[in-house]
A protein has these predicted regions:
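Phosphate-binding site of ATP-dependent enzymes
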Residues: 1-78
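C-terminal active-site "lid" helix and adjoining low-complexity regulatory extension at the edge
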Residues: 68, 74-81, 85, 89-96, ...
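Short, low-complexity Ser/Thr-rich regulatory SLiMs
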Residues: 40-42, 103-107
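Protein kinase-like catalytic core scaffold
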Residues: 25, 46, 99, 112-114
Length: 153
């Protein structure tokens, strides 16, 4: 067992019986132009490209072999309006005001959802892309505290 994603091997399939009653996630192996970490803060969406497809070692799970050329590996990304709206709607449907969403941009199929994390990491995105995520959080907290104070009066 590993905390990282890896391609399923014949050996893994032989061991499947030992984890048959455990939660296990399998996912289709996807061709990808790039991966995206989308951070939703309130009604703001910040998307960062992760250029994992450029390196065969990182193509399955970029977290396993972090890149040392970080300026080239991460970049901000402008999501189409409909994709931004879907991300905001998902976070709202889950009753949250924040979510870290992982997407893949497939060459033919477009944006493909992988997962959402209600407590995902975002500091590294701001550090390497300059996206103002901390500022968005600060503004959201001020807005929420103002609404809370008004409701109590």
């Amino acid at each position: 067992l590993t905390p990282f994603t890896h391609a399923v091997t014949e050996h893994d399939l032989m061991r499947y019986e030992s984890v048959r009653r455990s939660p296990v996630l399998f996912q289709e192996r996807l061709d990808k132009k790039l991966e995206l970490r989308v951070t939703v803060v309130g009604d703001q969406v910040f998307a960062a490209e992760i250029h994992s497809a450029d390196d065969p070692k990182q193509s399955v799970d970029w977290r396993r072999y972090p890149s040392f050329d970080l300026a080239r590996f991460y970049a901000s990304h402008e999501l189409p309006f409909e994709e931004k709206h879907r991300c905001i709607r998902l976070v709202q449907e889950l009753g949250q005001c924040f979510g870290a969403i992982d997407l893949v941009l497939h060459p033919e199929r477009g944006y493909i959802f992988l997962e959402i994390n209600p407590n995902g990491q975002w500091g590294w995105i701001e550090q390497f892309t300059g996206l103002p995520i901390a500022e968005a959080f600060a503004n959201l907290l001020v807005r929420l505290s103002t609404n809370y104070s008004s409701a109590r009066e």
